């Protein structure tokens, strides 16, 4: 009984951290990386699809991405999608290749991004704590239904607390990495 609750909590906490990593990958640092454009959607024959489904995205150098659409007709649509995304990038096309230079971040912009990153990390911590609460409530329901003893509940709660602590520690590590990456000049 308690094992399934713990497994569920662990899986959900892991998903929270994975979600945090995905959100942080979208936040632009001064360096170019292909996952930066992952969430950019391009209109392709009437439906919006991720850019990775209509073009190759490569890193040309530390500050430049190259996007090569598979169809020549898609060049302008891909360029427009990158321009209108919330990333603040200004692509330029050269024939069938779109170059996306990464502008250097100002100190002020870096600080703003750090605030955003900290907010995302806090959201992940809150999600993990909510998962802990759900697990503890499930344990209380089992005690109430006389399916487990109070001692078993206490042991399980302690284990869930350890899980919570380790996952929050992981969130802090991810946050520290991203902050360090953002503050690099």
Swiss-Prot record:
It comes from the Bacteria. GO terms for molecular function: ribosomal large subunit binding. CDD domains: RRF. InterPro entries: Ribosome_recyc_fac, Ribosome_recyc_fac_dom, RRF_sf. It is found in: Cytoplasm. One of its GO terms (cellular component) is cytosol. Keywords: Cytoplasm, Protein biosynthesis. The keyword Translocase does not apply. SUPFAM superfamilies: Ribosome recycling factor, RRF. Its main location: cytoplasm. GO terms for biological process: cytoplasmic translational termination. Belongs to the RRF family. Responsible for the release of ribosomes from messenger RNA at the termination of protein biosynthesis. May increase the efficiency of translation by recycling ribosomes from one round of translation to another. HAMAP family: RRF. This is Ribosome-recycling factor.
